[in-house]
Amino acid sequence: MLIEDAVSSGTPQFVIDSYATLAERAKTQSFGLIEEDVIVLDTETTGLSVQDNELIEISAARLSGREVVDRFDTFVHPKQLISAEITELTSITNADVADAPSAVEAVAALADFVGGCPVIAHNATFDRSFIESVKGGVNVSDIWIDSLALSRIALPRLASHKLSFMADLFGCDSVSHRANADVDALCGVCLLYTSD
């Protein structure tokens, strides 16, 4: 996909040129907050409602500067069965989660992994609400950064701010509706937001 096709009509040429070189510049730029360790996180759930659905996968990466220095990946054993629709979307089956830790155990392990670092998630309100609905989930992090909101500020002329769209456009890892692949894509996209 060409940058010209991915921006809103009427976008000035200098903005298009800036977006076109963004991925290359992100490899060499100096960053602010991103130079500190941050946790890039994604979850998969049995549905969209925090009241009616549950976590089934949590993935996170510790990003230090431009490098992923540690990973956290776990399935989560839900109390309800995973529907065929969710299995089709995520490829996560009931067999995958059968011996997985409970949500309380998984979120406690996540809190240990995060260790007080800021957490970045695409549409962070969704992931945070599921994490914090679990006992002990409020202890995961005090700082949650929504990369969706950040992309709308940093790249306002993009036609879409979906993670899959941006990952494809800027040559980051692909998005697959699996938490670990989405974390890989988001790590790449996060570096784009903060380049000069």
Task: Name each region found by the language model.
Residues 4-5, 10-143, 156-177:
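Conserved non-catalytic scaffold segment of RNase H-like nuclease domains
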Residues 181-189:
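Acidic, divalent-metal-coordinating active-site segment for phosphoryl/phosphodiester hydrolysis
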